[in-house]
């Protein structure tokens, strides 16, 4: 089943309004491919029917969760993007820690948005352990990680990874 330009724009804008994910027009094929199975499973006839289902059906909340699952890309790994992590570890984090120490508040909050299966927030925890070493136990540190996908969050909570992920 092929998605029309109008259907794509309708769904793209709806997805953006619901979860903040913007899908460029050159990625229309992704929407078509990823949503075609949902449309079949719901016995709908078109992408317009799916859009209306998402907006008006009584079970739309459940379907929104499934929509978020299929439109998100869960690219993740431990120590992903080394140059960025190096700047965080050697420049950003030490500056923040020094400011906290000077203020007499050894409290740190980090938010990992779009954490997928958890490799990024666990990487941040490892970096904190390496930077703070023996001082770690005197700090109040919380890393909050979230994602639109409940399935990947469940994997992140388990914190069990295979050799390939490591």
Predicted feature descriptions by range:
Residues 117-136:
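Conserved SAM-binding loop of SAM-dependent methyltransferases across substrates and taxa
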Residues 113, 134-166:
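Extended basic-aromatic, gly/pro-enriched interface segments that bind polyanionic ligands
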